[in-house]
Amino acid sequence: MKRDHHQFQGRLSNHGTSSSSSSISKDKMMMVKKEEDGGGNMDDELLAVLGYKVRSSEMAEVALKLEQLETMMSNVQEDGLSHLATDTVHYNPSELYSWLDNMLSELNPPPLPASSNGLDPVLPSPEICGFPASDYDLKVIPGNAIYQFPAIDSSSSSNNQNKRLKSCSSPDSMVTSTSTGTQIGGVIGTTVTTTTTTTTAAGESTRSVILVDSQENGVRLVHALMACAEAIQQNNLTLAEALVKQIGCLAVSQAGAMRKVATYFAEALARRIYRLSPPQNQIDHCLSDTLQMHFYETCPYLKFAHFTANQAILEAFEGKKRVHVIDFSMNQGLQWPALMQALALREGGPPTFRLTGIGPPAPDNSDHLHEVGCKLAQLAEAIHVEFEYRGFVANSLADLDASMLELRPSDTEAVAVNSVFELHKLLGRPGGIEKVLGVVKQIKPVIFTVVEQESNHNGPVFLDRFTESLHYYSTLFDSLEGVPNSQDKVMSEVYLGKQICNLVACEGPDRVERHETLSQWGNRFGSSGLAPAHLGSNAFKQASMLLSVFNSGQGYRVEESNGCLMLGWHTRPLITTSAWKLSTAAY
């Protein structure tokens, strides 16, 4: 539905505008009439979900009141607005009907003394967010206009009555802006303050106007995202399509993490509406591998995952002469140099270290796992660790069989199995996770380390998954805001954006981002014959020290839960490291 609410801008006028007002009124009436003839229900839905407390059937009366307000404001002298109450409801323009009534009543008070310093009327601007008024369809409504009162002497006040506030494009105007972040229900909103100072030819300041784009747009953006997801769940794609277009405009008005998160979720929603699934092929896997390296360099989440898992493995290998690690998430092998160095420094000398890496095939059919193994072999030679390596290419961990791993007797070789952000990808394949856990039982490891996202993105209801993922990734993006701008940071955001796109836009086996919480994984592991192995207090202390490198540790938080370690941002856990072993009944 078309709307005639526009961005507030300062305007000075003491001339009548009855003829133009009449023309505007007719246009408004015709526009409202057209809207009432068709699409009224859709307009009411859009108004409701975006927080506007007015019906399309009331727009004719709203248009008349707008005309009255415009006429009254254009006829009020410069001192005619000083009586406006500071607590009047026009601070909430979403309630259009009551807002207009209160504005009209405020503009018709007893006359004030001539000496009072007032301000000139504020009239709607014909454009918002760069869209012409004729195309304006529930676009973002900015915040309030707040006036500062400059010192004006009596000799200059009479001259000011005939002046209009100049636009910011004037060479005599100066614009400054600042922004601060605020958190709204787990999503970051932004308050943008713009100060415009207009000067005369002599350089004198005549008026200062501060336009404040408050948290209202951020709240409206979140409501639009949720409403769009709900419309998709109800298969109301017409409404969802209209809402996703609104989200784009609302996101532009934000800054920082809020804008980035909303943009990625808007893209994912659009892909789901128009059935444009993101690619799921070998090239995409290779790209994700590269993006994960940037994510590793940018923030502590992967470093925390590797460090805590390595600490658990190191303790489990204590006193063993031959050790074997089977890595379900080999990728670039970033986890293992630190473990190899720790083994090299072990009292009594390093053990013989065997590493089996499992990863997806490369798009060019190159043996990238072999290349990773060669680099690790060079490191092992430099630190005097006897090293053996073998790589396995598999499209899925569910294709793995224990007989492929060349297992040796447990009394001669201790085995550890490691998985970082891999097991959740099996949940979309029927029987996939059960098969892999069965292979783990056949391996009989002394320890099975698992790192997964601490969130439930695998429920049967799309709206619930969307809500949880919106909060989760908003927190993740917020934690990245303290990182200096760099290519690593940009690529890290793309890495997370790809996860959002898969989680929201895909279904069935194509949806691989099926994260679950620690309690859910605990139930799965318990039913497969695995028992928790508590991580030691030493791992907790050293993980806390690791975080001090990132943003001086501010914002990040490590906490222990049932023998597992969680890393979060402020009060929200984001990833969890857990360790498991075969239960007594499994032997």
From Swiss-Prot:
Residues 1-26, 152-181 are annotated as: Disordered. Residues 371-403 are annotated as: Leucine repeat II (LRII). Gene3D superfamilies: Transcriptional regulator DELLA, N-terminal domain. Residues 153-175 have a biased composition (Polar residues). It is found in: Nucleus. Residues 292-357 are annotated as: VHIID. GO terms for molecular function: DNA-binding transcription factor activity; promoter-specific chromatin binding; transcription cis-regulatory region binding. A motif (LEXLE motif) lies at residues 66-70. GO terms for biological process: gibberellic acid mediated signaling pathway; meiotic cytokinesis; negative regulation of developmental vegetative growth; negative regulation of gibberellic acid mediated signaling pathway; negative regulation of leaf development; negative regulation of trichome patterning; positive regulation of DNA-templated transcription; positive regulation of gene expression. A motif (LXXLL motif) lies at residues 423-427. Residues 212-581 form the GRAS domain. Belongs to the GRAS family. DELLA subfamily. The DELLA motif is required for its GA-induced degradation but not for the interaction with GID2. This is DELLA protein RGA.
